[in-house]
Amino acid sequence: MKVASYNIRKAVGRDRRRDPARILDVLNALDADVVVLQEADKRLGQRPSALPPRMIADHTDFVPAPLAVNDVSLGWHGNAVLVKRGVEITGCTRIDLPFFEPRGAVAVEIEGRLRVVGVHLGLLRRHRHGQLRQLRRILTERAMPTAILGDFNEWSKIGGMEELGADFHLHMPGPSFPTMRPTAMLDRVALTHDIDLRDKGVVMTELTRIASDHLPVWVSLTLPDAAAPRAASAGG
């Protein structure tokens, strides 16, 4: 199974143009079974989606997981999950991550075999620590194969993720920010130990370098006790 994460910056590219179609082109090229998005909704008012649902339906093979609390948003606190048509969603959860800088996470169960969690953590490390503690506490209440993906906002390659504890193994697909000259591994993946990581990567193309300020990252996974629903491609 191939799972990807992409901070789309509300579909505003490095050229300062808001271009949802450009983001959808990137998503199509990922060829992923599941894509976790950050900054998928605008910040003001009812937080309307930066990717119009009709465009998603007409121009991709993805279906949004039902995470929004209204008719105009795509996700929760800007976190959204898209799944390929035909991939069964067996559960959805919105998770509050309070503290001074309120954030949220989303959890989507795929075919009862994998829980995909999307996060966009705070800018300050002490807030991130609190958010990770809360997230780990909630997730460990019900054990199942789990992949946490998103913008962890952690610049250090060796610290800052201690609150994940021993339940998760952290993977960094590579530098993904900023797109002009990627140096920071902000976009990461944490897996429970019952999931095998087959491959990982960062998608750097002419399109991804301008479509957002983050590059998409992806992982190819083997789930426990069963073959993945379809053969995952090894590239981005």
Regions found by a protein language model. Give the residues of each.
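Active-site regions of metal-assisted phosphoester/phosphodiester hydrolases
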Residues: M1-V34, K42-R43, D58-H59, V63-L67, ...
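Short, flexible/disordered intra-domain loops and linkers
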Residues: L44-A50
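Generic structural marker for isolated residues within well-ordered, non-membrane alpha-helices
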Residues: P53
